[in-house]
Each structure stands twice: as structure tokens, then as C-alpha cells.
Amino acid sequence: MWDYTHRWSARSAIVLGLFLVVEATSGAILLYNAELFRASHSTFYHHTASADPIDAEQAMHIVTREHPDFAAGWVSPDGGILAVGSTDFSSAYAVDPGTGRINGKADLNGGVLGFLVNMHDCAFTCAGSPGTLSALTHPVPTLGMTWLADVTWGGAILGVLGLLMLFLGISGIILWWPTFARFSHGFRLRMKKGRYARDLDLHNVIGIVSIPFLLTWGITGAAFELPVVEKAWLAMTGGTAPDEAKFAFTPRQTATDAPTLSISDATSIAHEHVDGRTSYLTVPTPEADYYAVSMAGDYAPYGHRAFYSGDITVYVNSHDRDDVKVVDASHGQPLANTFYDKVFEPAHFGWLVSGWWRVVWFALGMTPLILMITGLSTWSFKRGVAKRRKAARS
């Protein structure tokens, strides 16, 4: 059993290799996506203090008035400004609430950060982002398996990578966890016993310490692309299959001459149903004639995300203030589902904690790179010893 596990662990490590290192390292960088975006767009985030700042409704009107060809679809308070974004979430104008002036326009999917997001989140399938490969956007053959429906080649790559990371974590527990007789050896660091002992101990200790995060990233990462993984996890932990219609909202019919609610009206209605701050709001469209108000409460698992930091959605019929639907994972489902939605999945991104605490996520996100370096070091050392012994025998 030990040799079998060791063999398959080694093979999966080879397959993961650079893919795992690139995926994990890019993910570690993207933990600070919001902070890096704000730092690299200082003019965009310029804002002034005012006793009477403008609100989201006014910001939307300012942008649509000055840029009538811009398809404004949402508005979000972020970093002191009011961002008015496009319907395809690709760009946004920043409005200074203190002066009502437009600071400028930003490409939300461009640059180095956009490339990293496209690589890490989409496997180069995000439309309109740098590096997109059209070949990876095609669906994979289902081979009669319904759970593969709508899965692209890019999604399959990410899903398999997540599953392999999960297997690597499980096999790592089997290989690295010490017996009770030599418990202390599993966490020792022989820093003065030579290169091989040092790197071997670093490999083992860092590996076992990072296991909880690797398992979390593996499960949630695979589940993003392969929903069957989430269903399996929830079934094992006492939950139920996710409600696929949870975020569907069909506004009821109203009189054709019924007045349209304003952004301020929709925001006020949302606050009547949910305590918290408004993260962002999408405006009605011909295809979806309602407001969607994303809210963040005291516990905000996505609270440190740029623009889209809410975890509770309030749908408001744009012509009927009494036609409202609240989607909150804290209510109406088993505890296992709530834990997954409110803790487990958000932990993948680290947005539930501040940037200082996210240093822990960053350090553990770099472990695949460290494990590769220490693994190569011990392998090259053993290979060198074997060569010298062979030469001595000959």
C-alpha cells in the first residue's frame, strides 16, 4: 500500500509539476488583486471629502449623460469612489462622490492582472481578456456523462488540476503523517545536518502544514468547473444538492404604465430587507427587468473583493416595490450548505480576511513552488549519490 501510494503520488506530482506551480503561484498573487488594481489605478480612485457627496443614482446619471454610448449596467462604491460599470463587466468609469467629476475609465480585465485572472480562473477562456485561446472555449465530449455538459476544455483543465491537487493532498497525508512512535520526527527541521536533511525536512513540514489549504483549494477549485464535485462534497458532509434556481428571479406582471423605480428606491428597498452595506447594484435590462442589489453584512465573506464584495442578493421588481426576493445562504438550507457558501468557498480567495491576514494565504499558496524546489533538491542529491556509488563499484 505504501509503495503503491508513493508511486502514484510521485506520478501525480510530475503531472501537476509546472501546472500546479503556475496555477498556485498566480493564485497567490491574485489574493491581492483588489489591492494591486487600486494601487495601479491611483487616478481612477482619486476622491475628495464632501459634506454632501453624490449617491449611486447621481453617479449613474453623470456617466450616462457624458458618455451616452457607454452601456452602463452596474454601480459600486469601491475605494472611496463610485464605479459605474459596463453591462459586460469589462470596464468602468470612476466618479468622485465629493465633486461629481469623472476620474476616468479603467479596463477591468486588461493588463498583467487581467492575464493572470484569465490564466488562473479561466485557463485562457475568459472572453475579452489577454491571452484567450479560442480552442479551449469549446465544450469537451460528454461521453454520455451528463455532468460534463457545458464543460469547456479550459474548465476541464482547471477541474482536473483541482482533483489532482486534492489527490496530492490526500496522498501527502498518508506519506508524511508520522506514526505515534516517531511523532516528533514528522515536524523536525534539521537545518544543520546538510542540504539533503534540511530540504527533506522542509519539504515534509511545509507540505503537511499546507495540507488544509491544498485540500480547500483542490475541492473548491474543481467544484468551480465541475459542479458534481460540490454536490459530492455536500452529500458527504450532510448537505443537499445546490438549488440551481436560487439566483433566478421572474418579476411578476405589472401595469404597462407602472412607474419605474429608481436606483435609490431599489437600494432603500434592499436595506428594508437586509442589514448591511450595498456592495454593487445592477440596473434593469430588457431581458431582466429588475434590480439586483448585492449586500454585505457584518460578516462579509467576500468583503475585501474589489467592486463585487457582497454575499446576499436582493432582487427588486423595477415596477413593484413589493415584489422582492432575498437570496442569503445563511437561511433556508442545511448547515453544510451554509458552511460551504459562507466559509469554505470564500476561503479559496481569502477575501473574508484583511490583507494582513491574507499573508497566511499567500505564504501557503506559494507552497507548491517551495515543494517543487525542495523536491528537486532532494532528488538531485540522491541521484548524485547513486551515480557516485555506481562509479565507485565500477
What residue spans do the PLM features occupy?
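Conserved histidines in hydrophobic membrane contexts and catalytic metal-binding motifs
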Residues: 1-394
